[in-house]
Amino acid sequence: MCIRDRSYIKPGIVDDIGTSMDLFTTFSHMADVAIPNDRIIDGNNLISVFKSLSKSPTENFFYYWGAELMAVRYKSYKLHLKLHEAYDGKPMEVLKTPFLYNLDTDPSEKNNIYEDNLDVLDKIDEIIKKHKNDLIIAKDLLIDLK
């Protein structure tokens, strides 16, 4: 994400997680617009990141393909649970042994460090369980157009 407003945003680079879901919350706060409190808002307010280059409040990100959880990002780690090439026509592959990468040291995701990081895997497993417990399945507006 690249944002520029020298009157409001401190110039610099933050190498943390930020998603498009954070834009609604952040821009609402910047415009002094109240965030709805009658529903769960997935995005985080990134104003402190923009103003002081502090760490992002977003530590986790869930990669979905439709309703399928494909991968999970936790801090600098990314765990792939399933693989699916978007246009090759092959079925989705559920990995017997997931792929774990440290994106700080391996941004190209070439070296699977799954076997050497059981503590990270335990933490990501906790994150997945909490996420699935908190998840509210919404109607798929692209499929359920009836």
How would you describe each model-predicted region?
Residues 7-16, 20-99, 103, 138:
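C-terminal cap/loop subdomain of S1 sulfatases and analogous C-terminal strand-loop tails that border
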Residues 106:
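Intrinsically disordered, low-complexity polar regions and short flexible loop motifs
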Residues 24-28, 47, 51, 111-114, ...:
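Non-transmembrane alpha-helical segments in soluble domains
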Residues 51, 143-146:
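Basic/polar N-terminal segments that are highly enriched at the extreme N-terminus
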Residues 10-13, 110, 114:
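Active-site oxyanion-binding pockets that recognize sulfate/phosphate
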Residues 84-85, 113-115:
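Residue-level structural signal for beta-strand termini and adjacent loop
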Residues 1-3:
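Short, small-residue-biased leader/transition segments that mark boundaries at the very start
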Residues 56-59, 130-144:
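Bilobed periplasmic-binding protein-like "clamshell/Venus-flytrap" ligand-binding domains
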